Amino acid sequence: GVQKTVVEAPSTVSAEKMYGFLLDMDTVFPKVLPQLIGKSVEILEGDGSVGTVKLVHLGEATEYTTMKQRVDVIDKAGLAYTYTTIGGDILVEVLESVVNEFVVVPTDGGCIVKNTTIYNTKGDAVLPEDKVKEATEKSALAFKAVEAYLLAN
């Protein structure tokens, strides 16, 4: 099955700077949220471009240890970036993959980050709504922490 969430987050960070973060999140996240994305990011295949597969070692504040991601879209002109979580213990029993699509839309005085998350479950399994809500809330907290970091740097 498929479950989907769409979140739009306004920011006073410029669209260019916010998109730059998306492209560089592997180095920024451990600085901003070491307790979540703490240890390291290993490139397993590729050079950072579309098709790259990486293994993210998660921090102590999460119950999971690893997340395997594949880069699917890098559209610098359209300020779009998509990656899919394809492995690691973060994919709980019912999940096959999780697609994260980001589009940064410039606004007067900042941007809006549109984040669509698509949960692909095994067969007709359903991810419990509280898990979806928890993931959405964690993403919002991470976004606020990143925004504060980008505004300060």
Curated annotation (Swiss-Prot):
Signal peptide segment: none
InterPro entries per UniProt: Bet_v_I/MLP, Bet_v_I_allergen, Plant_def-hormone_signal, START-like_dom_sf
SMART domains: Bet_v_1
Keyword presence, Glycosyltransferase: no
GO molecular function, one term: abscisic acid binding
A cellular-component GO term for this protein: cytoplasm
GO biological-process terms attached to the record: abscisic acid-activated signaling pathway; defense response
Pfam families referenced in this protein's UniProt entry, alphabetically: Bet_v_1
Taxonomy, superkingdom: Eukaryota
SUPFAM superfamilies, alphabetized: Bet v1-like
UniProt KW keywords: Allergen
Keyword Oxidoreductase: no
Assembly, per entry: May form dimers.
Family: Belongs to the BetVI family.
This protein's name: Allergen Pet c 1
